């Protein structure tokens, strides 16, 4: 029954689709949950789906034409110029790492489309970023000047500062006008100013996003190239292990001076002893063995010598003791009988 009722419901109108998609974008940008959370990603996908429907309806209605100026666009239709910018902002919120490069390129196309429209209608004075074709043609000129000059860097920095200040002023004006416009109390001139300020704000946002997108695309490209290089190197056939080699100079030196360390033994100890005994060069060879009589005489001679040395020591000891006694007993010590 409910499905049958849904079939007879009128399709959503363009303003309703636009307001719903803008509300989803505001909720995604102001969400406290992580961007990769399921709740935020569902809002991102739903917002992109609604914006696709809005873009198709705008194309069917042919709401904007290159034959008209900005003043010819009605105040209530100015907000639909921001649809490509909304698409780029929500596309940047997708968090699929494998499709990150595709998302960046899609978001850049949306922002470029928005800036091209604003540049054509002269919503604000700004320099239109290069498209992919222009950047490819000027690649040689860019690489020829590897490092930008200090003047160019200073001008870019000053432009960013000016955009930031302008963005803060626009946000302050929009916050003061928002309640009156959304409640329907503002007049047509006030509504037109409100949407023109929104268009200028999204111009600044789009320029900043394109700069960050170009930097991220460059980083991803360098990462992919380094990965391909590492893969190609790993795919190379492994070289066979190198064989040990000997320098001719070292080999000749080893033949003359040896290997530089003691060689292995060429004979056993028994062979060495037999060889030296044969040539009569052992320490105990050439000394005649003593007879028993000679051994007895040598022993007796040694004993007599030791006895003489012992007697000499006793005589020397007695002489020392006598000298000591004379030192302590002078001549005439103790003889006092004939003295008066």
Swiss-Prot record:
Residues 223-243, 292-340 are annotated as: Disordered. PANTHER family: IMMUNOGLOBULIN-BINDING PROTEIN 1 (PTHR10933), IMMUNOGLOBULIN-BINDING PROTEIN 1 FAMILY MEMBER C (PTHR10933:SF15). It comes from Homo sapiens. InterPro entries: TAP42/TAP46-like_sf (IPR038511), TAP46-like (IPR007304). Pfam families: TAP42. Belongs to the IGBP1/TAP42 family. This is Immunoglobulin-binding protein 1 family member C. One of its GO terms (molecular function) is protein phosphatase 2A binding. The lineage of its organism: Eukaryota, Metazoa, Chordata, Craniata, Vertebrata. GO terms for biological process: regulation of dephosphorylation; regulation of signal transduction. It comes from the Eukaryota.
